[in-house]
């Protein structure tokens, strides 16, 4: 049994390891509110396209 078979073989059904950004597959800084499931970097990039507006 090599390293490739063991690495990431544990099932990820819940927790931070089970979710990733739908745009870039990043697992850090994930925004899950309203079912967005995108990381904060991608949110800044696509927020205007999604329909979010910056308030003064």
Curated annotation (Swiss-Prot):
Its cofactor is Zn(2+). Component of the 40S small ribosomal subunit. This is Small ribosomal subunit protein uS14. Keywords: Cytoplasm, Endoplasmic reticulum, Metal-binding, Ribonucleoprotein, Ribosomal protein, Zinc. GO terms for cellular component: cytosolic small ribosomal subunit; ribosome; rough endoplasmic reticulum. Belongs to the universal ribosomal protein uS14 family. Disulfide bonds: none annotated. Zn(2+) binds at residues 21, 24, 39, 42. GO terms for molecular function: structural constituent of ribosome; zinc ion binding. Its main location: cytoplasm. It is found in: Cytoplasm, Cytosol; Cytoplasm; Rough endoplasmic reticulum. InterPro entries: Ribosomal_uS14 (IPR001209), Ribosomal_uS14_CS (IPR018271), RIbosomal_uS14_euk_arc (IPR039744), Ribosomal_uS14_sf (IPR043140). Pfam families: Ribosomal_S14. Binds 1 zinc ion per subunit. The gene is RpS29. GO terms for biological process: cytoplasmic translation.
């Amino acid at each position: 049994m090599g390293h490739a078979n063991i690495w990431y073989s544990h099932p990820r059904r819940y927790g931070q390891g089970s979710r990733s950004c739908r745009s870039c597959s990043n697992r850090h800084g994930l925004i899950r509110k309203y079912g967005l499931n995108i990381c904060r970097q991608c949110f800044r990039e696509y927020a205007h396209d999604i329909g979010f507006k910056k308030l003064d």
